[in-house]
């Protein structure tokens, strides 16, 4: 495989045995594709906004003479770009303009003649736009809309598993779930009657629904039952025989025909008997007349003369009715065929409990159930019933629902409408009865074929439709008011309801979440999260164990490992690495096709529904060089996802990758296959909490997943086109694009501006650092600059640390860690946190608040860091309590004493009618001010600081644009120069003249002259565009800000805090091995090896066996080997050995065992490239051990050997304090450690004086409230056990809720009297009040 220039800088040795057939797909597809469908980037097909408009329009007036038609829509360009929206705190959105047509028809004309057409464009609010990274900027913060896993529309058959009724009888039910509209349920009760419910309301006999559809009793019976025909022949009764129906019954009479007895009375009829009857073609048998008694008539039998009903349909036949039927001249009687085994009489029984008798009474019954208390009329009942299931406006199964419905009921695919038909309802009842009869089985609700993904686009479309429907009602009213001559579409539409619905969804829906921006991985995982919670989903409390559990259909679709611990476990899942959604919203996963035992390169995506019929081999099945299975039997998944052994020729598909099963976060854990799943879950979750360190350090032991995550997360800058680096500094990179990638007529220069020191949602620091040099050749898609937690385009969440597993004086008890001081000195885990503090000046009733440096009663020193506008300088170092922005608020006039009045009169002091409400640094925080932004309302005069900031922004904008122009001009003039020189001009002459004069030259060659003219035009264009961009920027900067009502000014101050690692900080490895730092130990006290190299962290060996995460030990060994090879390379470089020796050693390392899929050939590298590679391998050879396909023991030992290290992975250590040898070798190696965002600085606080709870008068709790520490029940026991009575009394009274006692104590302390008088705690009063509220009087007698 060929490596590009930047890939040659550092190559990861890959232990994967299996070639990668399919690269990891773009990780944010699920978000971006869904939103593109919503705003319909691809104009084909009706979806998203288009579908919403089409479903609501045209809106027709009630009289039908006017209608408002939809023509098309367009999205405007957003006013501000993403970055500006974040700074200003506004929403990144585009205005929606819709072209509507108002058509009115002539009322007088008989044919619909058009009288008038008005068409214009209407503004319909704003639609938030998705950024390139799949997020939304709402009110200045980045948010993610999490996809939802909900029950797919369609029909589901289920049972209560015997839990409802005390007898344990299993009751079956069917539920038709539409995409929108009313649910229709059918269910059996314990007496086996079939009932229906609409929208989970009161149940009705199911036959009422059938009657409402217009079926009579006879038709209903015909739909659900087979018939038995009896013939009356004189005094004999003959029954038409269908032998198959007799199976399992006991004969109540001799079954005989043609003088031969086939079954004797009292015998059970078996298959042998049935065969004999079929063989002799017996079609009728004589039955005794008692046999027909109790059978049910299938239709009405009427006396033709009198018109009287002898036996109604569904009526039982008795001797009397039999005689009457014979008398009336009936020779055949049809009855229903039922038995106890597999043809139950359920519908017949239900008809008996059904109080209705015809269509209208059934409609009335449904109306009373849906709208209790309203008197039904025939019209309203009919309309209500039709609107429930048969109106396309109110009911929609959707294409997914119809597809699931047809598959479930074995209807032809693709037939049927979005509404229900009579046949649909009957088919559902039939299937439910079949299931009750023991044919067919219920669905599994947790099967991923019955749950589908609703992504951003679809949810936004639904919200948009809700808004449109609200608008539709208003428009209908307006259209029916008349006077339409003066009205235009613009007057009819009020965009408020639409923008309100959209805003509410993006701003406050349960699925619109504040993006987790701790590090690139947490961003990617958040966007790939699938939640079963949210509107229309489950709730935590109601979700049982089954829903949360791993299901076999999750294979390759949802990760079985990554899910939160706690109440949401199993409800929030993560998409597997290769999974995607199909058009219906079901999850699919890729497989390689297998033909006759040969695995092809062809890849197919299968959904769970399609997968059911195939046998699928695992990705680690052994193949020979022709891609044939080598084993006689292959482990594969067959029917129902159960695994078993199959012959190679029976296999249809094979997994594409071993990482297919897990999500990206779990795929980052090396040796995942050796970790217990519970710990792997913690590992996957904790990687998302890692704070980006000051200097990112790639993991020595990775999995190969680091690169795709870093690239797809969008934190690194990736080249859009290939070229050469022309300019690079800390804030911008300029690439001269390759000739073959430029578009004709453009300058061929790409400029990338980098993000510097900005704040993320979690207060971590986002900063991009260039990783290319001048003149480097660049390919498209390569990394130009590293973002937070990326190192040469690879995800780097933590640091490679030398660890030893051994006890050390109890400092690693219970998962604590002992850390060497060297780690702190080298700033290995130092992180930068940026806090945003804002100060808002409002207009109050008493007057406007003012931002000023003139603050009453504040000393000079407190104002030393403020400028004359009262705002802190950039670069000032501040600590808790310092003023950042001086602000005064007017306070109401107070009554002054005569003395004060006199003083006022003499000194004219007016300052005391304002109070200080300045923004101060919160307690316990300190840092450096790195940025200040001032936002001023339109029409309010800007202060000096705001003008300075404005001027600076204008200067920077102009400088940026000028530099951009210069770069582009240079590119353009270089082309002009080449053109002129190729036409014979003298280079030296050209360089003497002003460049702009070059464009005025004339060339004899016409084609070249045209090119020159084109370039001259481009130059003009560039100039114009520069002026235009500058003007736009200027307007944006000068323009007043759009602030909330009543707000005059907002000042935002950004503080950067540098945090070193310290005791109490939480750290973790990638295997769920987390712990807290107990002590920072001097380097000289740490255990060291024979070369005098100390370890950096000491971990507790007891944390490994019981937790069963052995992956960490293998990682440590492999890390040691990788570092050993790095050390060898480093030694060679230091000794300045010849390049060939270096090349062969590095080649040996790459060629060592287990390089199945990756071949690195260093002979194609130049000496310079080998040296650059060696320089990057000094700190260790990075290795990749893919999940389930990683390095094994033998390979690790070989690598250790090559690094000149003991193959046991254990080293003799010496105690740093005494220099004595420890009694046995210790496992030492390199582990990748992360610092998690649970820092002791954010958690520790101590209360001095603070607020009290209103009712109990006890101090509040928690850091946010500046609360105290609860002295709880168990702590009281401790003091009681010591007999410390006075201490205990103090704790329970004056230090807690004895209000008088604590004020007295304060007075005593102030007056120097160390005395305390405890009183009655407030809790006693509270409990007395509570007892009184129960109606019990309680009084305290003072005796």
Curated annotation (Swiss-Prot):
It catalyses: RNA(n) + a ribonucleoside 5'-triphosphate = RNA(n+1) + diphosphate. Its EC number is 2.7.7.6. Signal peptide: none annotated. Coiled coil: none annotated. Keywords: DNA-directed RNA polymerase, Nucleotidyltransferase, Transcription, Transferase. Pfam families: RNA_pol_Rpb2_1, RNA_pol_Rpb2_2, RNA_pol_Rpb2_3, RNA_pol_Rpb2_45, RNA_pol_Rpb2_6, RNA_pol_Rpb2_7. The keyword Transcription applies. One of its GO terms (cellular component) is DNA-directed RNA polymerase complex. One of its GO terms (biological process) is DNA-templated transcription. One of its GO terms (molecular function) is DNA binding. HAMAP family: RNApol_bact_RpoB. DNA-dependent RNA polymerase catalyzes the transcription of DNA into RNA using the four ribonucleoside triphosphates as substrates. Belongs to the RNA polymerase beta chain family. The RNAP catalytic core consists of 2 alpha, 1 beta, 1 beta' and 1 omega subunit. When a sigma factor is associated with the core the holoenzyme is formed, which can initiate transcription. This is DNA-directed RNA polymerase subunit beta. It comes from Haemophilus influenzae (strain PittGG). The lineage of its organism: Bacteria, Pseudomonadati, Pseudomonadota, Gammaproteobacteria, Pasteurellales.
